[in-house]
Amino acid sequence: MNRLKQAMSAVLLTCVVAFPAGARELPRPFPVPQTVSPELRELIAKVPPPHWDTHPGTAQEWKTWADAFSKEAAKTLPGLREKLKVGVAKGELGGVPVFTFTPKDLPEANRDRVLLNLHGGGYVLGQGESGTQEAVLMAGIGKFRVIYADYRMAPEFPYPAAVDDAMTVYRELLKTKPAQKIGVFGTSTGGGLSLILGLRAKAEGLPLPAAIAAGTPWTDLTKTGDSYFTNEGMDNILVSYDGWLGDAARLYAGGHDLKDPMLSPVFGDMSGFPPTLLTSGTRDLFLSNTARMHLKLREAGVPADLIVFEGMSHAQYHMAEDAPETRFHFSELGRFFDAHLQ
């Protein structure tokens, strides 16, 4: 079992210890498809995490859960960086903590380009180093320098803290290089936040990044969209909106309208957006979030492509670094950004 799969198992166990699972039962079982790699089949075959129906009731309970997640998730990251030959430097931009990940074999063509990574975690999980696995994989496989923004999160810092911090880092990057040399990417919450950054930059009159890659983006924080229902229980990562996920949406929103485009970018005006690449899976709870955003972008005349992985639940493309699907995903992101960044 590789490092990321070990980390995910440890994280799920820790979360179970921190908060007992609810009593809800999941729907029917599903066969594991034989049309995917053995590594992905192993992920698909896993039972859903028992903590999916956890409902922390206080800020301290949310913090306990987040801290447990961070502690376990961070354990394997030094080994992953070593395996992929990725260096790391800690710092800050505009007062926001950042990690800079640089592949040892950074191509000459990418030396003056940079990607901004916004991590997932429902606006409550993934603080510090614990959320950096996607950034490491992108640096190591996609061969770009990646700036990871450690943005503030709920419950201590609800909306608009996350997007404010993302914008602060983006503005700082614009001071060092033109937007045509900057790409933005993220998964889940980070995918949604990448799109929100584009909306916010447009509203502020800032140049938009050269390209955006939004993996299984959380584009609608309300329980709207077919796959919230059809993939409930089929997705063995998020499982259901009615677990901790819906609580996290309301916690971060802090009483604001969940359909505000600064929370749910699928309701925003996407005209003028840069080329955008979206990714999902056939079992992903956020498949409709992704498909709806793809259509919204295309309707606005934006060059937008959509990749849907067979059998994949939410964001499983960065949970097994040796899976062919993972290698394809991050190589494809590298090709996408190479095509659109100057």
Feature roles, as predicted:
Residues 19-23:
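Sec/Tat signal peptide C-region and signal peptidase I cleavage site
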Residues 27, 31-60, 64, 76, ...:
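Alpha/beta-hydrolase superfamily serine-hydrolase fold, recognizing
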Residues 1-3:
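N-terminal secretory signal peptides that target proteins for export/translocation
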Residues 9-18:
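Bacterial N-terminal signal peptides
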